[in-house]
């Protein structure tokens, strides 16, 4: 029918199309951001639920694989030094710059400010609105930077990934164009305030829109190498990995990295 994975609608199987009182559920999601709501719903209805990982301390479920505590994250180290920090994104990527960025911590660290911009809800898929909320994210982020006195700020633009999942190439092109313009605006603000911007990603998507056959849409993340652009003309940037970003930020701030960080400063 020409329906790819991204757009398969829910299916009800014949025979037993619903959960019965004696049924139990096993949740295979390892990420909690989309699983905890459904888990809570099942628990509230009295079902036995086992989850792959711990989704929330508020959910009393057996867990297949216990999580490891992540200590001395970048946000925690900045907080320990009394530095202010800003974390900003629209809804689709808000958890990525807060909960995930902070090693699975829900609460803000002292000195941490969070900025949430609602993602569009007027469309079913973002190829219909590839600009998403990027312009508002950039505007509010810039305004907060200008008055906040932050030592560190992180902002996520969701467009290349979220629109990339649609596989609709013209929409992805528009998404990247909008992101480029908004990113340029943010960099101008950072440089005007005397700061340095580090521009990177944690995975690819929009750069590969077709499968190897040259026809089928590619809608998944890629494992391609990602760029790291540093807007400091006085340094050269070495190849590295995502784990090197936090030590690089700390080096710019003149802070020693904790022993828990095994990465290195990429700017020489």
In which residue ranges do the predicted regions lie?
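Feature captures the catalytic ectodomains and active-site-proximal regions of enzymes
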Residues: 1-268
């Amino acid at each position: 029918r020409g329906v790819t994975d991204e757009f398969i609608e829910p299916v009800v199987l014949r025979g037993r199309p619903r959960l019965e009182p004696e049924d139990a559920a096993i949740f295979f999601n390892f990420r909690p951001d989309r699983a905890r709501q459904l888990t809570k719903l099942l628990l509230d209805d009295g079902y036995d639920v086992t989850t792959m990982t711990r989704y929330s301390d508020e959910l009393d479920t057996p867990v297949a694989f216990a999580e490891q505590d992540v200590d001395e994250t970048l946000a925690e180290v900045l907080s320990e030094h009394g530095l202010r920090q800003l974390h900003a994104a629209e809804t689709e990527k808000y958890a990525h710059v807060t909960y995930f960025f902070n090693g699975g911590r829900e609460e803000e660290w002292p000195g941490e400010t969070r900025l949430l911009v609602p993602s569009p809800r007027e469309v079913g898929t973002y190829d219909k609105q590839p600009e998403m909320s990027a312009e508002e994210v950039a505007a509010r982020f810039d305004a907060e930077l200008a008055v906040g006195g932050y030592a560190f700020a992180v902002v996520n633009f969701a467009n290349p990934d979220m629109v990339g999942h649609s596989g609709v190439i013209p929409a992805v092109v528009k998404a990247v164009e909008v992101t480029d313009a908004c990113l340029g605006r943010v960099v101008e603000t950072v440089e005007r305030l005397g700061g340095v911007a580090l521009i990177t990603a944690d995975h690819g998507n929009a750069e590969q829109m077709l499968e190897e056959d040259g026809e089928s849409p590619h809608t998944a993340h890629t494992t391609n190498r990602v760029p790291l652009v540093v807007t400091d003309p006085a340094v050269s940037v070495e190849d590295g990995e995502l784990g090197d970003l936090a030590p690089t930020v700390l080096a710019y701030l003149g802070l020693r990295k904790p022993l828990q960080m095994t990465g290195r400063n990429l700017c020489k």
